[in-house]
Structure formats: C-alpha cells, structure tokens
Amino acid sequence: LEVKDIFDGAVVTVGMGFFVGHVVHVLAYNPQQLTDDGIMAILRVWAGFSSTGGFIGAVIGSVLFYRVMRKREYWIHADTIMFGFPFAWVFGRLGCFTAHDHIGRLSDFWLAVQFPSGSRHDLGLYEALWTMGIAGLFYLWRNKPVKPGFFLALFSATYAPIRFVMDFLRNDDMSGADVRWLGLTPAQYGMVVLTLVGVILLTKTAGVESKEE
C-alpha cells in the first residue's frame, strides 16, 4: 500500500461523504428547504449533515477514487481508511453531545441529561460510548491477518443495528424533531441496509487470511 493512495483516497472519500451527507440532510430530513431556497439549499454544504448520507457518500467517494480515478485494489484500500473511522467518529459524536444536537425523549435513565424541558436521552452521548466499544474491537484486531473488507464488515454489523434501535429514542415532541417516514427515521432505513451489508460481508471476510493468497 502507498501512503499517497490512502491519503488521497481518504480525502475524496471524506469530501464526498460531507457533500452527500448534506444532500441527504436536505432531501430526506428537510425537503422544505429545497422549496424555500432552491439549489442554494444544496450548495450550502455547511448547513446540516446526515450521518447516514455521509456513509452513502463515503462509499461513492471510495468507489469513485479506487475504481475510476486511480485504479487500485478496492477492498484493502477502503478497509485501511475504515480502520481509522470509529476512532474519529467517537470525537465527532462527543461533539454532538457537547452541542446537544440529538436530544431524545424524556427519560429517567441514569445517563439522561437534564434540559429545560426535563431529563432526556442524549443520542450523541450514547453513540459516542457505543463507538468507543467498536474502536476497542478494531484495536484488538489491529495485528490479526484479517481478510480485506473485514473492518468495513465489522463496523457495519456492530454499528448499524444499535443505531437503528437508538433512533427510537429520538424526541418527537420538540421543534425540529426528526421527520418520520412510516414511523421510522430516514437513518433507520439506511441502517437496515447497512446491517444486511455488514452481515453479508462478515460471512465473506470472517477467518484468517491465508498467506498463500
């Protein structure tokens, strides 16, 4: 692996993740912004972000880079980028917790946070704590001879189902509450797909990579 290939691929992957994350934020969560502001709602990429859209964008960006822009073996390069992701995601979600971007339902749970409207779940905190566990798994597997794609599979299979459940804790009684489509948030539909992808990939990447391969 060349450092330049990893670095450049990560830049394209992250950049596309931010762009598509914003597009999904507008189209899936706030379509009225498109009606009110037209194309500017899309171009203001700093004005809102969907993490699920970010995952979609990251896949698009990595495939575009390693399959089209600079053809390289896809899975080992994408997996190398993915290895660092949960460690960064912990800090991202701690930022969400600090800003209280994802206030949940009223609760007397011991980790609930006190707000003017009462004690509530804070999904940024919960997700940061869960992702710390995922990062710990990645660290434990860091020197094992895993097959390319294993870390992509591991993250998808461990993150997505828990995120699906956590979204049921999001508030629906405050202004700015997440939109629901047939009772589920847009992210929950994405997590169903990500879970399936993760499980399928795990069945293909589980086990130790053969030295002869």
Stretches with model-predicted labels:
Residues L1-E213:
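A feature for loop-to-transmembrane-helix boundaries and adjacent hydrophobic helices
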